[in-house]
């Protein structure tokens, strides 16, 4: 029982952390399923709660380590004391058992006369041994609370926005104000290319020609004639396309009038919807008349195209007249002026880009002006700090002179007044 009373253990009572109160977000996340996951807005709260749990766990761990160290030291000290006790009994009980120490005592008395007793040197020799086994109780290490680094991280993130403006930052602003070399490239409108139908027709024709050339090459290989692939040139493709367009422009009925003339006549002639020509009765012609007209309406004459002179000039004249009246747009206008949805949207975005660039340039000019003003103020604030140091030095000199019970010299007073006036002038410049 005495050993238990002498035990230095404190038996700390560890209080468990209430997760529902201290860590509600952590408890809610644990209660979720794996499919729900964790949101980005919850990470900061989770970090703080996990730091709280880590600090409490480390606190308990340090207290347990301290208790373990105390118990180990106590056991070592207890064993050393038992060893010391046995050593003392052995040293004190050894002289009566052996005869040699008595002879040494007699020789010492006969040779040296009265002197210090024989037991005193032994006591001197035992004292250092006792000092070797002396132990001092180490104080219990109080567990240190882990350092909260959140304020330091916060001020480190805020410092760049509150620090003094440097000359490099001003130089960066000046470089940003320089117009970029490729600024004009953003406002160029690319020329209008070929229509997609023409481009696709050209690509399809090229593809067909390549396939035909490959098929011909395969046939030549079968016959034993090895020849290179013949690819159609782009100019040949354009010539073929123009030829096909010219062929398609000619109507099947062989009408010599142009497309514009036909459209104009179709717009002017009223169509008889009630009685179409297919249902209209065909009048009977007499045999003579039919015989006379038979030569003109023979099948051989129907295949020949109907020829009318000056159809091209008529087509161009009608076109000019319609353009003059404003009923038809001129095709001589450059392609850049042709308005379409893509061009309108492109010009709209270019106008927005110009307005935004002008706004940004204005703000950069204002920012550069404010930065230069702030740099000059920083220099004044630096001069104020230097003036404050000079004023404090003059004040210390005057106070040292008063402590020594001597009046300050005229030089010291003049220096103090001079530094004060300089400081006031700098403050006026800073406030102005």
UniProtKB/Swiss-Prot annotation:
Domain of life of the organism encoding this protein: Eukaryota
Tagged with keyword Transcription: yes
Region (Disordered): 87-126, 272-319
Cellular compartment(s): Nucleus
Tissue-specific expression: Ubiquitously expressed.
Record-stated family: Belongs to the NGG1 family.
Complex and partners: The PCAF complex is composed of a number of TBP-associated factors (TAFS), such as TAF5, TAF5L, TAF6, TAF6L, TAF9, TAF10 and TAF12, PCAF, and also PCAF-associated factors (PAFs), such as TADA2L/ADA2, TADA3L/ADA3 and SPT3. Interacts directly with TADA2L and PCAF and also with the high-risk HPV oncoprotein E6. Component of the STAGA transcription coactivator-HAT complex, at least composed of SUPT3H, GCN5L2, TAF5L, TAF6L, SUPT7L, TADA3L, TAD1L, TAF10, TAF12, TRRAP and TAF9. Component of the TFTC-HAT complex.
Listed name of the protein: Transcriptional adapter 3
Organism per entry: Homo sapiens (Human)
Top-level taxonomy: Eukaryota, Metazoa, Chordata, Craniata, Vertebrata
Gene: TADA3
């Amino acid at each position: 029982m005495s050993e238990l009373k002498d035990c230095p253990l404190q038996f700390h009572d560890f209080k468990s952390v209430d997760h529902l109160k201290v860590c509600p977000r952590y408890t809610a996340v644990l209660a979720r399923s794996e499919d729900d996951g964790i949101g980005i807005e919850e990470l900061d709260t989770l970090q703080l709660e996990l730091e709280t749990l880590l600090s409490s766990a480390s606190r308990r761990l340090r207290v347990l380590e301290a208790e373990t160290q105390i118990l180990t030291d106590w056991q070592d000290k207890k064993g050393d004391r038992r060893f010391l006790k046995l050593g003392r009994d052995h040293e004190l009980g050894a002289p009566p058992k052996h005869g040699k120490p008595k002879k040494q005592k007699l020789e010492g008395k006969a040779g040296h006369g009265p002197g210090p007793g024989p037991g005193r040197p032994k006591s001197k020799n035992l004292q250092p041994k006792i000092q070797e086994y002396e132990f001092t109780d180490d104080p219990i290490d109080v567990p240190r609370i882990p350092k909260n680094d959140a304020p330091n991280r916060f001020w480190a993130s805020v410092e760049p926005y509150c620090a003094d403006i440097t000359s490099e930052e001003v130089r960066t602003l000046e470089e940003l104000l320089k117009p970029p070399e490729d600024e004009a490239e953003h406002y160029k409108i690319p020329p209008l290319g070929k229509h997609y139908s023409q481009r696709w027709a050209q690509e399809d024709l090229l593809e067909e020609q390549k396939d035909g050339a490959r098929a011909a090459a395969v046939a030549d290989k079968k016959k034993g004639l090895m020849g290179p692939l013949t690819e159609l040139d782009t100019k040949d493709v354009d010539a073929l396309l123009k030829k096909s367009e010219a062929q398609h422009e000619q109507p099947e009925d062989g009408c010599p009038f142009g497309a514009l003339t036909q459209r104009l006549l179709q717009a002017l002639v009223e169509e008889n919807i009630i009685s179409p020509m297919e249902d209209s009765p065909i009048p009977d012609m007499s045999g003579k008349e039919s015989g006379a007209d038979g030569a003109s309406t023979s099948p051989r004459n129907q295949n020949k195209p109907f020829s009318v002179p000056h159809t091209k000039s008529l087509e161009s004249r009608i076109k000019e007249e319609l353009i003059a009246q404003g009923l038809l747009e001129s095709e001589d206008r450059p392609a850049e002026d042709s308005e379409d949805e893509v061009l309108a949207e492109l010009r709209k975005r270019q106008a927005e880009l110009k307005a935004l660039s002008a706004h940004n340039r204005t703000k950069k000019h204002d920012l550069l002006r404010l930065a230069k003003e702030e740099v000059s103020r920083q220099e004044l604030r630096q001069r104020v700090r230097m003036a404050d140091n000079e004023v404090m030095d003059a004040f210390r000199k005057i106070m040292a002179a008063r402590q020594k019970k001597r009046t300050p010299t005229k030089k010291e007073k003049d220096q103090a007044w001079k530094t004060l006036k300089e400081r006031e002038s700098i403050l006026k410049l800073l406030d102005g």
